[in-house]
Amino acid sequence: MVMTDPIADFLTRIRNANQAKHEVLEVPASNIKKGIADILKREGFVKNVEVIEDDKQGIIRVFLKYGQNGERVITNLKRISKPGLRVYTKHEDMPKVLNGLGIAIVSTSEGLLTDKEARQKNVGGEVLAYIW
């Protein structure tokens, strides 16, 4: 079966593992998933990200992060631009997620960026997801 939206699948796997309080999540690797995982690590939503090479496409291992009392760091993830309805925005109209408490992941001509980085670099692009 062909997967029509690997980004939505990746976000759903993170959401499900987070709800079940798993420590580690493994997903099939791709460049876009690696970029999203790196942004999540840089912004402090996950502990660590490892890429494991194998004979096929590789595996991304994401180490989820929780607070001291076991509360989830990632409250929710939402896919915005979908294969059936793409969502593009200019840098002036870049959305702020929960007034800056969350991030938007944007695919730009300069690669994957957060909404804040895209605003600073004055580049727009496709809004892939909101994470808060």
Swiss-Prot record:
Keywords carried by this UniProt record: Ribonucleoprotein, Ribosomal protein, RNA-binding, rRNA-binding
Gene3D superfamilies: 3.30.1370.30, 3.30.1490.10
Any Gene Ontology CC annotation: ribosome
Top-level lineage group: Bacteria
GO molecular function term, any single one: structural constituent of ribosome
Gene Ontology annotations of biological process type: translation
Family: Belongs to the universal ribosomal protein uS8 family.
Function as written in the Swiss-Prot or TrEMBL entry: One of the primary rRNA binding proteins, it binds directly to 16S rRNA central domain where it helps coordinate assembly of the platform of the 30S subunit.
PANTHER family, A to Z: 40S RIBOSOMAL PROTEIN S15A
Record's protein name: Small ribosomal subunit protein uS8
Organism: Streptococcus agalactiae serotype Ia (strain ATCC 27591 / A909 / CDC SS700)
